[in-house]
C-alpha cells in the first residue's frame, strides 16, 4: 500500500513541471551515489526518478529531479499554485516558503503519505520532489532531513 501511495504522490509532484533543454540533468547529480543506493525508475536528459531498493523500511521514498524552463522556474506564484492544487485535493500543508512546500497528502490505516517539493537554482533550475510513504507520522524535522538528503545528490 505504501509503495502505491508513494507512486501516486510522485505523479502528483510532476503535475506542474516543464522541462528545460540546456545541459543533461546527470551532469548536475551524483549519479554514482544514486546508483549505489537506489533503483532508477525513469531517466532522460531532463528528468530522473529513483526510489528505495526493496528493503523493509519504515519510510519508503521516491525522489524526482526535473529540469525546468527558466520562465516556469522564475514564476513567483509556483508555490502558491502548488498549495492551491494540494488544498483542492484536501491535503494538509505542513510547511511553505518561497521555494519549498511540504504536504501531508493522506493518512489511512496507520500509513502516512507526504510530498515535498522544492525548487533549487544552485546549479540549474531544478524541481526536487520527494514522495514518502511511512508507517508512522513524520515530524517536520524528519521531512526536512529527507529534503536535505535529496539536495545532497546535487553536485
Give the predicted meaning of each segment.
Residues 1-4:
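Positively charged n-region of N-terminal signal peptides that target proteins for export
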Residues 11-12:
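Repetitive helical segments and hydrophobic/amphipathic motifs
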Residues 15-18:
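C-terminal motif of bacterial Sec signal peptides marking the signal peptidase cleavage site
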Residues 20-22:
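Bacterial signal peptide processing site
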Residues 27-32, 36-110:
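Short, solvent-exposed recognition patches
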Residues 89-155:
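A short, solvent-exposed beta-edge/loop patch
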Amino acid at each position: 500500500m505504501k509503495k502505491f501511495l508513494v507512486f501516486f504522490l510522485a505523479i502528483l509532484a510532476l503535475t506542474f513541471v516543464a522541462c528545460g533543454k540546456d545541459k543533461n540533468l546527470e551532469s548536475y547529480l551524483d549519479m554514482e551515489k544514486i546508483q549505489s543506493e537506489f533503483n532508477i525508475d525513469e531517466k532522460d536528459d531532463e528528468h530522473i526518478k529513483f526510489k528505495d531498493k526493496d528493503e523493509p523500511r519504515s519510510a519508503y521514498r521516491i525522489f524526482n529531479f526535473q529540469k525546468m524552463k527558466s520562465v516556469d522556474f522564475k514564476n513567483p506564484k509556483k508555490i502558491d499554485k502548488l498549495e492551491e492544487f494540494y488544498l483542492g485535493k484536501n491535503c494538509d500543508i505542513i510547511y511553505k516558503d518561497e521555494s519549498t512546500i511540504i504536504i501531508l497528502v493522506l493518512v489511512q490505516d496507520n500509513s502516512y503519505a507526504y510530498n515535498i517539493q522544492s525548487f533549487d537554482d544552485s546549479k540549474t533550475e531544478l524541481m526536487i520532489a520527494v514522495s514518502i510513504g511511512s508507517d508512522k507520522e513524520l515530524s517536520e524535522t524528519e521531512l526536512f532531513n529527507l529534503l536535505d538528503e535529496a539536495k545532497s545528490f546535487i553536485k
